[in-house]
Amino acid sequence: MSMPTSLVECVPNFSEGNDKDIIEQITRPVRDANGVSLLDVDMGADFNRTVVTMVGEPEEVLKTVIDCTRIALELIDMRNHSGEHARMGAVDVVPFIPIKGVTIDECVKLSERYASSVSEEFGLPIFLYADSARMPQRVRLPDIRRGEYEGLEDKISLPEWSPDFGPAEFKPNMGATATGARSILIAYNVNLDTDDKSKANSIAAKIRASGSLVKDANGEKIIGEDGKALRKPGIFQSLQAAGWMYDSSTAQVSMNLLNYEKTGLHDVTEAIRQEAEKIGLNATAGELVGLVPLSAMLSAGHYYHDGEDESDENILVENAISGLMLDQLSDFEPRSCIIEWAIAEGVES
């Protein structure tokens, strides 16, 4: 079986991370679809969130994720949801990512068709973000999701936060959904040997693009001439980061690498190590959520390779796994975690 000439990745995030039966039902359309491969199902109990990764031909991916959404909206009730991760809806975010033979503009159209179909069928408020955003304040997902589910009823009533698709009204059981087209994003977390989330967040503030608030001697934020709070930029321009809890005893720096070619996995790992050491902590483990491009692993592998120039991809990947501490929480299976290798495995099977 040959690999399709056009491939789109879709990574829907569902606000359920504990009930395996519900996730099994939600992902069944992917397992049953022709022309779509289920690459990863990442359930997080503390986040109460599951990240599903599928890849396939554009039309089949669109149909399949709509089917998954239909099931999720029937089974997940946001009135009963709690979890560590920021969220605003049962189907929280649905990104479309070009992989092969597809442009970002074509993925924008896929996201718009998804939003139109789902909002029409369920009356679900949907916001377009990233490359699909129709206004500047909706490019960044954290801006759309600010206030989360609990603040959505008030937020959606504001004219400036009227959804792009669907009614401007609060749906208590469903919440709202964000969808859009974006480039490949790497979700990557680094655990620390502390249970103090504030320490993880202080490290996150030093490395993320948005940085931290500038405060005066009394600890009050300083307001600039434009009326906005002044911020001190962090180390990396293409990084989102925050402090979360991996479990009840382990804090972590949770990140989205928006441009892994500019800001690599090894770059953020080493920065976290350095910042952690300054406050008497250690980085203990790395965690990838979803899949990672091969080139990102090879880049990290080159960084952590001690010997002469190495061209063997398998050796470089092993170097990356060790350097990024990806084998500290559980066995890291590169054949199922690296996008290109996972696609090849799916085609061969």
What is each residue range found by the language model?
Residues S2-S349:
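Long, contiguous binding/interaction regions
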